[in-house]
Amino acid sequence: MQADLVLYNIGQLVTSRELDKTKKMDNIEVIENNGYIVIEKDKIVAVGSGEVLKEYLTPATEMVDLSGKLVTPGLIDSHTHLVHGGSRENEFAMKIAGVPYLEILEKGGGILSTLKSTRNASEQELIEKTLKSLRHMLELGVTTVEAKSGYGLNLEDELKQLEVTKILGYLQPVTLVSTFMAAHATPPEYKDNKEGYVQEVIKMLPIVKERNLAEFCDIFCEDKVFSVDESRRILTVAKELGYKLKIHADEIVSLGGVELAAELGATSAEHLMKITDSGINALANSNVIADLLPATSFNLMEHYAPARKMIEAGIQIALSTDYNPGSCPSENLQFVMQIGAAHLKMTPKEVFKSVTINAAKAIDKQDTIGSIEVGKKADITVFDAPSMAYFLYHFGINHTDSVYKNGKLVFKK
């Protein structure tokens, strides 16, 4: 076996390889100094510490001395509303002044504003806008992003969002995992006919699946959005069609969406700021990943999800940006990690696990990405920081030094 690339003299190497089969949040391998990674083509072929075995080296092997830097798997942002038209900075002053969201909505703002902008945008306009976001994410060390639809809310514009996501996968290095989320809100044309829209979403499901445009189906199970019964109907059909499931749940009130996620065997339940003991118990007795979005709580000045309580109950947690034009207009997963430490009281190992192997589990990609292990994709991020603790302590800057995607250098500061 001959190496194309060797990264060596690594300071702290966070492989995120799980050391046992438990759901513990701190059970990941960390090589404390002088680590190395050997890469052949797009795969990792060796990981260790000390001197690299000569059997891997040829005169053509590229040797990169990382001079004691922090190295992790490529970060994974497992919950975003990536593709959307427009922005909502005009609502920011109203929010600061304390204007309620429903009042903003009545003035044509909120999700209705983004709905209009997304419907009016061409595919090319959405591509150009989203490419900028993906570049920001890559520069922050992110190599895989989940992307939801849900700002079209009709067949034509939901397909447009999903087609744009597919095209973007070919135009830049970040891997995109697509989620169909027409059940994000009820569009104005169905304002007085919620049942009609539920049926419309169910009709869209086979069309999206037939075109191979989405791997997951998500729904906003929330008071005055979609009930538990409506969510169950949509997600049951989706599951029968071969979609994997996600659920926005317990964001504003606890409606039973978390319990539904466990009942249906969803891959993840997301938000969870208002999760109850019943919901925690349901997740603890399932394999559902709790995908928490603390930058949304930060931006809305709302309560954070009870991460410590969930961790102590044996729940696996991922952290994501929730990047969207309303409640979290930020692509910065590094900041999310720092909030995770400071406000969710997560340890460095817990934080880094939540954006690597657990984030991979939240998009069902744990067999190929999310950890630095032999046989996995060589998606690797190098940070100009000596340790996980320093990275989390020194907030507000971009720590990324370089990013490797499938064994190729795709970003260098």
Curated annotation (Swiss-Prot):
The gene is hutI. 4-imidazolone-5-propanoate binds at R88, Y151, H184, E251, S327. The keyword Transmembrane helix does not apply. It comes from Fusobacterium nucleatum subsp. nucleatum (strain ATCC 25586 / DSM 15643 / BCRC 10681 / CIP 101130 / JCM 8532 / KCTC 2640 / LMG 13131 / VPI 4355). Its EC number is 3.5.2.7. Zn(2+) binds at H79, H81, H248, D322. Catalyzes the hydrolytic cleavage of the carbon-nitrogen bond in imidazolone-5-propanoate to yield N-formimidoyl-L-glutamate. It is the third step in the universal histidine degradation pathway. It comes from the Bacteria. Fe(3+) binds at H79, H81, H248, D322. This is Imidazolonepropionase.
